Amino acid sequence: MIKIYDTMTRSLRDFVPLTENVVNMYVCGPTVYNYIHIGNARSAVAFDTIRRYFEYCDYTVNYISNFTDVDDKIIKVANEAGISTKELSDKFIVAFMEDTAQLGIKPATQNPRVINYMDEIIAFVSTLVDKGFAYVSEGDVYFRVAKSNNYAKLANKTLEDLEIGASGRTDAETERKENPLDFALWKAAKEGEVSWDSPWGPGRPGWHIECSVMATEILGDTIDIHGGGADLEFPHHTNEIAQSEAKTGKTFANYWMHNGFVNVDNEKMSKSLGNFVTVHDMLKTVDGQVLRFFLATQQYRKPINFTEKAIHDAEVNLKYLKNTHSLPLTDQMNQDELQTYLEAFQEAMDDDFNTANGVTVLFDMAKWINSGNYDQTVKDAFEKMLQVFGIVFEEEVLDEDIEKLIEERQAARANKDFATADRIRDELAAQGIKLLDTKDGVRWTRD
């Protein structure tokens, strides 16, 4: 049985979906005002790998990941560029789809955009106001944190802890609140900002309400898994829980999953440190599948350290797997040994999607394959395991000239013309084709 580390309970829990053999997942997507950075890619790859493993286990996965296209940052960048917020968002949504495609990330079941859910957002906020969980102040609408049961339970904090942290705030927005911890559900429009009409005047939604509405509209009041980066645990996911459960009276998500950060040369990635790297730029020099493999091979909850050596190692390891995959089939295979690898892989991945251990199994299996155990059954199993990591190797077809040279070399060897055979081997090596003579015939790999 798959076990998931649930942030809410701080424990490993057996995964039991609401509907048998169906997984409903909502993963917070990017705010689309710039190209995604390697930290965004870590989250996208981690949850894509989790989705793929559920599918490997024959679950049907409804995978929802949103685009935040209404946000303070988007408004600021669009104004600076002299374009509309929609033009800016459209540009970076396209860039996101292109970049993540190179990382082998499957398209989501749906990618909802905030601008398409404005009526539903206004209705959601209105319900919270009617139920006394929210109040209007000078055109803004705020959520009453004090009325929420166990607010910040996800972040393992108490209301008292948060109030101490919030003490001393004197900004204009705080003056409009009943409590410094109250957060905006709806923001009154400022001059020149994009806005929508509402019962409280023109404005736009707050960040937290957007995800609650899109998740519940598509997947229902209670979902199986809600995921995102560890930085979203508080306040974003905390506030999602508070407002969603206040509206519905039901548990918002049964499992909360958060991926770890990406460090660059052992320092947390940040713009202030100047080690901020966009995926768009990285893909100009690093193959997308290599970057994907690097990100996928560390267990999703742990931090991962981005270095040139780590990328080089990922490239070398991926090449070994590719060469293994391209080996010609043999008649040799031990079913019991194959089953041992399949069970070891499942054991690793069932343990909170431990991809680090899963990759170890992959390489153990590759070593076994290289010893001659590679019939079609083994190849199919190997490919299915690779696909969990988003790795798909295209069947490489040698051109006719190279095929002809290999045949000529085989004929020369049969005639004991070893000088010709060696010459052809060297000629092929110069073209990047490495030959391996085995009892089952000649195998080749491309350097």
Predicted stretch roles:
Residues 9-12, 18-104, 437-440, 444:
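N-terminal, positively charged nucleic-acid-binding surface of large information/translation enzymes
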Residues 81-87, 108, 301-305:
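Short, polar/flexible loop-turn hinges at active-site or ligand-entry regions and domain interfaces
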Residues 1-33, 48, 98, 119-327:
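Alpha-helical recognition segments enriched in aromatics with Gly/Pro capping
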Residues 97-119, 233, 288-290, 295-296, ...:
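Non-catalytic interaction-recognition regions
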Residues 59, 133, 433:
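Short phosphate-binding/catalytic loops that engage adenosine nucleotides
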